[in-house]
Each structure stands twice: as structure tokens, then as C-alpha cells.
Amino acid sequence: MFVDQVKIYVKGGDGGNGMVAYRREKYVPKGGPAGGDGGKGADVVFIVEEGLRTLMDFRYQRHFKADRGQHGMSKGQHGRKSEDLLVKVPPGTVVKDEKTGQILADLVTHGQTAVIAKGGRGGRGNSRFATATNPAPEIAENGEPGQERDVILELKVLADVGLVGFPSVGKSTLLSVVSSARPKIAEYHFTTIVPNLGVVETGDNRSFVMADLPGLIEGAHAGVGLGHQFLRHIERTRVIVHVIDMSGLEGRDPYEDYVTINNELKEYNLRLTERPQVVVANKMDMPDAEENLQAFKEKVGDEVKIFPISAVTKQGVRDLLFEVANLIETTPEFPIHEVVDESDTSVMYKFETEGVKFDITRESDGTFVISGYDIEKTFKMTDFSRDESVRRFARQMRGMGIDEALRARGAKDGDIVKILEYEFEFID
């Protein structure tokens, strides 16, 4: 089964916890703190594997969670960093953040990698908190939580040429004639429901990859007839070969077909109109085809170059292939998304915190709920089993301005304050 879009969950590994320990050696009184730091959590890394051709494997495994870092140890020993979790994807995979729609990675070449979910840093051991006024601190941090997100994987086939047109115009037959590909061919609409790829050799030491894309219908740009799934694969092609049935046996007008398909390409993505398009008048071996071709030429005008062919008899196919090969040589590759200006925005793949530090809401029972990336991260990295860590967390909340914000919202002694699933009493 060909699968070209899936939604999966990824989570980087949490950092290892820091250690509270002290140096205990003979003849070394008051040895001081010796707790090591936790190791960094593993990243979730996508890597291109050229042997893959579909996202089928992701239908059976949709959750990818990397290992956490090793905890810190005594004698100042730091925890080990965990090995990154490598997730193999086929060439042509685009990774998008499900929540924001931001493109996180465009993976096209074998061995190319991208970090999709970063692991958290290790928590600091108590040796990191030693000061002149507190030489033996009872403080250590928990590991930083790893980044987690839902992502959409979209596979866009890597082909130089894309065959487009209405169903049953002869796209699959043409591909089978010019390459070794063997797409399914039958006398009914939508015989092709997945892209088929074939390597075409022109006979003069030139070759290119051609994709037979499923037939389009009116409204495809809006998703009609699985239009989004089909049009997605045209975005990477450099040349569009527009196949039109000149026989008229389907009861459609060739010129109306031409206008409809071009409108669908334009409505789906304006960049598709920038690609050179070769118009192919197919089924010229059929009755009335020549008459229909002349009427078609009168409507489109002389500026549109038309290649009359018969995919069945191979009439005109050779000239068509030479024209396509020439266009590929002179047409650059088109990016599938706008290039991000890194001077004004964040670098792609960078794990960024939210701009707002915290938000305070009040529930119907009077409980104050504090949320936000910074405060939730600080909370998760605090070891509440140790008094000094609790006091440090209270100082951090004051430093963030949370105490003052709670008072401004009307919080009084004894009111309940909630962070994540934990509740505290507010003490003014």
C-alpha cells in the first residue's frame, strides 16, 4: 500500500537527574559536595533512507520516544548522554509541525538528517550549587523535559517530470511505453490511485524520472476526489506534461479539459504555473482525433506548443521525449516552500521557548492555575523531596514575577495555586 501522509508523535528524551552526594574519604574531613550532573536526553532524528518509497511503516508505529539521559552519580561522575533515536524516512519527506503548520524539515537526499525533537539537558548535581555561604548544598535539579510535538509527514515523490490530466487520458500507457514501469492500465477511471515512477532514456545518453500521477478532476485543488493527495506530488517536478485525450470518446471537450486542469494547478499552488508545461495530444490514432486537434489549436493559439502522439502506436513519442529532456536541462529545481530568511527569523529545526513566561487563570472554585513553558519547565526540574530545592523554586517564582501577579489577581493567604497537576497554598 502506498501511504504518503501520516501524523505521528515524537518526544525527545528527558535529561538525567542531578545527584546530591558528598565526598567521603578517609583523612578528608568536610569533603564537600560531589554530586554529578545528569546526562543529556536523546534527540529524535529523522534520516533519509533511499530504499524506502512510502510512509507505510508509520501506520503501525506512530509514537517515537527517545531515551532519557543517565542520572548523575557520586564522586562527581556525570551521567552518560543517551544515543539519538534515528527514524528512517523515504526521500521526499516533508515534516510539518501539526500545531503551527511550520515546515521543520525537507528531506530529499540519502543520509540527510534533521533533529525533530530535541532531548532535554541533564539536571545539575549539588556540586554546581556550592557557594561561599552554602558550601554543602542539598540541591540538585531534575533533568530538563525533552521536546514533544505532533508532526505531519508528507511524502512528495522525487521526479523530474509529472504527467497530469483527467482520468483515462493515457498517462499510464505513456509511462509504460517510455520506461520499464508497469502501472496498472484498464478501461475505467482512476485506475491509477498512487504515483508510479519510471526512468526514461531518450536514446542520446540522457535520462530522467517521470511520474504518472493519479487523474485530476474539477475541484481537485479544494480536495475533491483526493485532489490534495494527488496534487502534492507535482510540487517537486521541474516539467509538467499535460496529457489530453483528443479522441473525444469520453464525451469531454479537449479544450475544456485543458483549461480545467490548468486552473486546478493554479488554484492549488501559484508556483506550479511557473514550471514549463508540455501539452500532449494523445490518442491521435483514434477517429475524429485529427479534427478535434485542429479545433483545439484554434482555441489555444500558436503560443502553445502541442505534441500529437499515440501512446499505443508510439507515434510522436520520440520527439516528445527529446523536448522534455531539453526542458529539464534548462529548468532549475523549484523549492517546495519559501526559503526562510534566517536574519529575521529563527533557524529551522531550532527548539524555541514560548515568548510569554506564564499565564494565570482562575477556575470556578477559586483555584489559580499557572501555565507557561518557563514555569512548567522550572517546576519539572525541581526536586521537591529536598527543602533547599523547594526554597529555590519559591525564589524562582518570585523572580519570574508570579507572586506579584497572583497578588494582583486577588490571591490571599491559603488560596490554592495549581501548576500542571499539583496544588499548593499561596502564602503572602
Swiss-Prot record:
Top EC class, one word: hydrolase
MF terms in GO: GTP binding; GTPase activity; magnesium ion binding
Domain spans labelled Obg: 1-158
InterPro entries according to UniProt: G_OBG, GTP-bd, GTP-bd_Obg/CgtA, GTP-bd_prot_GTP1/OBG_C_sf, GTP1-OBG_CS, GTP1_OBG_dom, GTP1_OBG_dom_sf, OBG_GTPase
Keyword Transport annotated: no
OBG-type G domain ranges (all copies): 159-329
Protein name, entry field: GTPase Obg
OCT domain span: 350-428
GO cellular component: cytoplasm
Cofactor(s) required for function per UniProt: Mg(2+)
Localisation: Cytoplasm
Keywords: Cytoplasm, GTP-binding, Hydrolase, Magnesium, Metal-binding, Nucleotide-binding
Binding residue positions for GTP: 165-172, 190-194, 212-215, 282-285, 310-312
